[in-house]
Amino acid sequence: MKLSMHKSEVDLLIDKTKKLKISSDNYESNNQNVENYSMSIFIVGLPRCGSTLVESIISLNTKVKDLGEVNIFEESYREFKQSEKRKSLSEIYWKKLKITDSKTITTNKWLFNYQYAGIIAKAIPNAKIIHCYRNPLDNILSTYRAHFATGNNFSSSLVDSAEVYSDQDEIMRTYKKEFKNHIYSLNYDKLVTHPSDEIKSLIRWLGWNWNDLYLSPHLNNRKVSTRSNVQVRSPINTKSLGCLLYTSDAADERLR
């Protein structure tokens, strides 16, 4: 039913990943001193991967400005190419952020920035990329059941969803080998099962001082406009684990 209403764009999405990997390979690294720049956090993955929970945890830091799901980096990259590289990509990106305080830490939760992870690591000084992922069958079935307002048409098909999951998993494995100091792997299943250990590990990687408040993201009163709004208003729990018990053989076969 969903597929008849929304044509999947899976081939275009996977082709884009490949092209941006080539662009990343050809991009000259930015060797600026990271100490002169505030931290830019990019939360990446696929829809329904636990990213909203992670964003809620991080934004409990009072120095963090939560940008939400904004496609600013891709817009900046297009402008960078159109300007024939007269301006630096980081300069264009920060101008679009409209941040007046240079000490402000930002979180950008445009999930498909996973395709740009290599370019981000090279272009944005002090960039931190958090890759959120979960059990693939849980993730695939969760996106299939969801009804997104716009985009994510690949979720109309279990097979296409599996293709996209495999694509982002493969490219992130590659980028993690190349930019291991820039990318943090966050397993949603572990996060909700052992929240204290996983959250402390994340905060330590970010180089922040510990605060017990990070264990209570449901107390964060920030506005959440995604489908995860209800979930993040509740204490961390494991209710969303185990969707794979009801999945189809089609997605399972594609991931083998």
Language model segments and positions:
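Alpha-helical solenoid repeat scaffolds of the TPR/TPR-like class and their adjacent stem/linker regions
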Residues: 1-101
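Charged, solvent-exposed alpha-helical segments that act as regulatory interaction surfaces
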Residues: 2-7, 149, 208-212, 256
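Single conserved hydrophobic/aromatic residue that forms the stacking wall/gate
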Residues: 246-256
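PAPS-dependent sulfotransferase catalytic domain
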Residues: 61-67, 72-83, 100-245
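Short hydrophobic/aromatic residue motifs in ordered secondary structure
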Residues: 53-54, 138, 255
